[in-house]
Each structure stands twice: as C-alpha cells, then as structure tokens.
Curated annotation (Swiss-Prot):
Binds 3 Mg(2+) ions per subunit. Pathway: Terpene metabolism; oleoresin biosynthesis. The keyword Lyase applies. Belongs to the terpene synthase family. Tpsd subfamily. It comes from Pinus contorta (Shore pine). This is Bifunctional levopimaradiene synthase, chloroplastic. Its cofactor is Mg(2+). It catalyses: (2E,6E,10E)-geranylgeranyl diphosphate = (+)-copalyl diphosphate; (+)-copalyl diphosphate = abieta-7,13-diene + diphosphate; (+)-copalyl diphosphate = abieta-8(14),12-diene + diphosphate; (+)-copalyl diphosphate = neoabietadiene + diphosphate. The gene is TPS-LAS2. Mg(2+) 2 binds at residues 602, 606. GO terms for cellular component: chloroplast. Mg(2+) 3 binds at residues 746, 750, 754. Its EC number is 4.2.3.32, 4.2.3.18, 4.2.3.132, 5.5.1.12. One of its GO terms (molecular function) is terpene synthase activity.
Amino acid sequence: MALPSSSLSSQIHTGATTQCIPHFHGSLNAGTSAGKRRSLYLRWGKGPSKIVACAGQDPFSVPTLVKREFPPGFWKDHVIESLMPSYKVAPSDEKRIETLITEIKNMFRSMGYGETNPSAYDTAWVARIPAVDGSEKPQFPETLEWILQNQLKDGSWGEEFYFLAYDRILATLACIITLTIWQTGDTQVQKGIEFFKTQAGKIEEEADSHRPSGFEIVFPAMLKEAKALGLALPYELPFIQQIIEKREAKLQRLPSDLLYALPTTLLYSLEGLQEIVDWEKIMKLQSKDRSFLSSPSSTAAVFMRTGNKKCLEFLNFVLKKFGNHVPCHYPLDLFERLWAVDTVERLGIDHHFKEEIKDALDYVYSHWDERGIGWARENPVPDIDDTAMGLRILRLHGYNVSSDVLKTFRDENGEFFCFLGQTQRGVTDMLNVNRCSHVAFPGETIMEEAKLCTERYLRNALEDTGAFDKWALKKNIRGEVEYALKYPWHRSMPRLEARSYIENYGPNDVWLGKTMYMMPNISNEKYLELAKLDFNRVQFFHRQELQDIRRWWNSSGFSQLGFTRERVAEIYFSPASFLFEPEFATCRAVYTKTSNFTVILDDLYDAHGTLDNLKLFSESVKRWDLSLVDQMPQDMKICFKGFYNTFNEIAEEGRKRQGRDVLSYIQKVWEVQLEAYTKEAEWSAVRYVPSYDEYIENASVSIALGTVVLISALFTGEILTDDILSKIGRDSRFLYLMGLTGRLVNDTKTYQAERGQGEVASAVQCYMKDHPEISEEEALKHVYTIMDNALDELNREFVNNRDVPDTCRRLVFETARIMQLFYMDGDGLTLSHNMEIKEHVKNCLFQPVA
C-alpha cells in the first residue's frame, strides 16, 4: 500500500509517546483464522517508530501495538530506602515540643504594648529632664543611673552583642552629653570621648543602609550641643562635615508649613529640630497616647521645651513598664502582633496557635484604619510595612479589609514608599508589599501596580548589595527575597516555605529605628527550636505514610502497568506539602490514592485503551460491577480491580467518618470524571479541535483536581452536609476555578510538547481556533491573563467562602496552588525525575532540618 508522501510527511512529528486514538491514513484487508475480516491500519506514531501498525475491525477498536512511553519514575523503593534518615521521634522531643508550645502560647497571651530592648540614646534624653519640683536634680534619676551602669567596655553605649558604628556613635554622644549636663560620671565621659574619637573616622566604612532613621537630623544637632558644652570631639572630620551638610540640605527642602500641617516622621526626631520648631504649633500634632510618634527622646525634648503634662504622663507610662530605661519607641503593639503571627505562619508552626493568632488579629483589626496603620494603635503616621503586612494577613484570615489602603503610599509616578510624602523605602517593606500584592481580588489594580513596582525594586536589590536594608538587619533577607520572587503566593506551599524560612529566620534579628532595637516576641530561639522539632516530627510521620502507600501501589499490581506514570512519591508530596498536620493522615492517603488513579486512568483513556474498552471501564464504574472485569484486557483488569477494592475501602472509612453511606457519592464523582476523559478520547479519535469555551468546560473537569478534592474532603475531620458539599461541588465557582487554573497552567507548559505528540486540543490551540487572526504568542499571553484573573478570583473565593469548613477551603485552594508549583517551569509530574520537584520531594519528605 502506498501513501501519498505529502500526507505522510505532514503528519510525522518527533516525540516520546504514541497518540491514544490514531489519525488513520489507510488500511489493508486481512483474513483471520476465525474467518472474520480485519483490517491492518497504518498511522503516524510518536515514539521511535513513526509509522505504527494496528489491527482491528474498525478504527475505534484498535489497540496500539507501540506502548506509550514515559520517563521512568525516580522514587523507586530502593531509592526511598536509601534516603531514609535515622531520625525518629523521641519521647524527649514530644515533651520538648509541648513545653515550647505552652511557652509560646504564654508569650502571645502576655502581649501588651510590645516587648523591646533598652535604647541608650532615648534613655539619655529622658535622663536630661530636670525635676519638675525645681530642685537641681533629674526628674528620672533612675535613668541617669542606668547610663552610669551600662557603659560598655570599649567606652560606648548600645547593644553589647551588635556593633553598628552609626548606632554606637549616636548613643555614645547622647550619653556623654547627658552626663556632662549633670556633671557626673567624668570617667565614663572620658572613655566615651575616646571611643568617639577612634570610631568616628571609621563610620564612613559603614553602609548607608545602616544609618538610623533621622540620623542626619539629630546627630549634627547634638554635636552642636557637645561643642557648646566644651566636649573635645573631632568636629572637623570629613564625615561630620558631610552629615552637617546633609542636614542643612534636608532642612532647606522642608516646606515651612509641612512640619505643622499633618503628622509626619519628622515628629520622630524633634530633638534634632529644636531651633526651628514652633512649640505651640507642634503641640497640635501630639499623638493620642500623649507621645510624639511613640518616641521617648522626641517626647522628652518637647517636654523640656513646653512643660506639657501629657508628655510627662507618657514618659511616666513608659518607665512604669521598663523601670530604669526606655526603648527607642513605644508602644509597638500592632507591629509585634502582626510580625509574631507572620513568623509562626512562615515557620509552619501556626497550627499550634490558632486561638492565639485569632486574638492577635482581632486586636489588630479593631485598630485597623482605611488610611493605613503604623507600628502602634495610636500612631498617627501609617507606614506601608505594617499596613501591607496587616492587609495580607487580615485578608487571608477572613477580615474585611480593602486594598485601597495601599493608595496612601503611592506617589504620582506610581512608585510605592514607606511613609506618606517621603522617598524612603527598604527591602523589607517592599518585600512585604510584594507578598501582599499576590492576595489580590479581581479588579484590584492597585495590587497589580504594587506587584510590578515591588518586583522591579526587589530584582534590582538582589543585584545591589547596598540595598540591604533600610529598616532591618536580618539573618538572610536576600534568601527571603529570592524565595518570594521564585515562589510567590500561588506557588508557595506551606511545607516548602517553612523549610526555607527555618533556614533564613534569624532568632536574633534586629531592626533599625532611630537606634537599633530588638523584638523578642518576633525573633527568638523558641520559635526556631519548635519549628525544627515540629518539621522533623511531621516529616517522620509523612515518611511512614509514604511507605504504606508504596506498599498499596505494589500490592495492587500497578507497578506492572507499563502504560502509565509511576509518580507515587511526587503525588504524595502534594497533600503533604499543604495538609501536613498529623491528624490529616487519612485525608493525605485518600488524596494520594485518588490522585494516582487519576493519573492511571488519564493515561489509560488518553493513550492506551480502545474506545470500546474505555466505555466498558466507564460502565463498570457506573454499575460498580466487578464481574465486567472478565471482558477487559489484563492491564485494565489490574486497573479496575485496584480501583474497585480501593474505593470500597475508602467508602467504608468514609461511612465511619461521615455517619452515612458515601459509596454512591464517590461513584458519581468518578462517573463525571470518566465522562470527561471519554469526551477527550472521542475528540482525539477524530482530531476534533473544539472551541475554547467547549474545551474549557470539559478540560476543567478532565484535569481531575475536582475528583481528588471531592473525595478527600470526606476525610478532613468535618461532617459534610449536602449543603456544604454543594459549596465545593461540581457546580460551585470555587471548584471550577481550581480546575480552570490547574488546566490552564498545565496547558501553557505542555501544549507544545503534546502538539508534537499529536494532541490537537489545548487552551492555546482552541483559543487560536476561535481567533485565527492572532499569533500563538498572543494566544498564550491571553491564556496567561485568563489564568491570572482566575487566580485572583480564587483568592476571593478562598477568603470569602466562610460557610465551608477551613480544612475543606484549604483543600480546594492548596490543590490549585500545588498545580502552579508543579507546572511553574514545565511538566513537573511527567518529568519530575529531572526537575526541581525532585528536590522539593526530598526536602519535604526525606531531609530533616538541622
């Protein structure tokens, strides 16, 4: 038989697999011993052999003679055994975990206005205040004594275990001025002067990003005081002259009325602006907490100039809390709560502190302001750092907050800054805005603008080491930025984020305000110790579960199936990466087994079975009839027996969990799934390219995520009524968006390879069919836009679907996210052996954290 060369050559493609239902080019009648007329069909193939011979009575009963080939699975039993660590959960670990949980719960419950460390700089300013009774003594002698007792061995004041030249120089200058004013501590003053002389010349070597807030305002002003007091300091150093020039330039740019028009960050540094401040006007900007922007030093300066009783009340309030010293700012109640919640969530230990997190967020929400929030509830100057953190966390926990709050921090050029009217921004605040921007709802253009702006800034920051950081000195802020850019919200699975943040988290991180300060309820060893113990404990349970599932796979005979992908470990990694808590072990097992069947049956319907056999398989599921297995070929017998036995067991366990029969429910879920598979097989048989809408209607089901979720949901620990099931059912928008986004990300990364293997229908190809005037690149871009919009809508469904139990919502939403991770760079399931997914599986399941 001869085939026209143009017909044959136009159909031959390279590839590793053979199309499921062939495009037939010709046939040759052949007799059989049974006397039936059969035909030999030739078709183009997709494996090493480009022309495939098939025999059958008609095209739709033709079994392939060349098996579809997939890359072999990496995670074989011997590989898993070789990676099994010696770690086991010891009773002492369990006891320590319980102790840490109790201690951290107490930490949350004791949160008041914020815990922080002493500021020698601010304490020196408070110690300056003369007694209000007219005696020639300090109003707060305990603060003066603190200065005398807390000079460091090198003659400086500040944090003993952290050295930043700017911070030490500033604190030391403030302390020697105060001691000189009170004519005490001559020895300490002299040692402080010697320190200043030796270090001031080296300060130029310090990164500009380490310069405290307002340094160029307060430092020159204090130097002027020191000179008037006769302190022998190196006033002519080039560095000092440069700082003085910066101060003068900044003051010249300052509009005369801005200082009094509305609260700004200038209120934080009034002690450095005393010669220009109108004290009567400035009193109108005093905060509700009686301070000036929560700054003890600024408030002390105002009190010494005005005698305002409210200022004195604020200082008494702070000293009542801290005793003989003051911090660099106080209160810090919103900042402390938000960052503590963020910390335990990123470390993956938040499941131990649900009530404490709710209490903390209720507190923050009760002080939420549509204009933004600052670090304290009565802080009149909002900042983008606290606001973005609050917007993201509150939204994800179901609080009603609007993204319009970010407009406060955007200038006319569309750039985002930390404080209103300023150009200051740092890596940490832009990172928090970026993280916030990914929890957008549909139509929130401000979130898209924030995403683009911050991504640009952060990518540039990675190339510029000087950009790290304006507001914080963190252990590995670069690592945090790299993770956030590579794994944004819709790709960031909880276990992967926990693993990454355990490595990046600094239990001794410090922040930069006017001086360096620490937040022990945000950065501490207890969080990190619990995170490591809990991660390794959970991972140990996961490895045991994976071994059980591997035994199920092997005992069911699935390892004998040559036509399908063996991806048991990768599939188990999916639920383990997000529904990781020990109490969801059964749910993870059901999720994994169901997912494995979706892969087996997808490969069966897509590339292996004839239409007749596929219809028989579907009918067997519909009738739930094991007797029909006798009519199936051997490999399909293995499939159906395993399917039948597994879901009978799952249904029985589901009956116990739900208190009612769930087998018919599971059957119906699978009937819908197999109908979608069958339709795709029928399309492929005749090389039919549907319209985009027709394709998506079926493909959002055939992606099989809904089947996995709808069956697994029965094991989330909740009694699911018909009403609840309907809210995540096939007709729900929530489930549809999960399937849609999963299908689109799959198609965008696989359509070219599958087209080379003979597949004719994908979101991109179907969209091009509807719009023949556009290019493939334009169609792909449009599909990405549809997916991005759907992800925004999925965010909204996840946040607002509060009638659905939390674990069910997580199940739907996280299943959508795991698809974004698997297909971020290609087909992460089929090609998982040589992709980053392999490392994720290893880190999540086999490699304990040290």
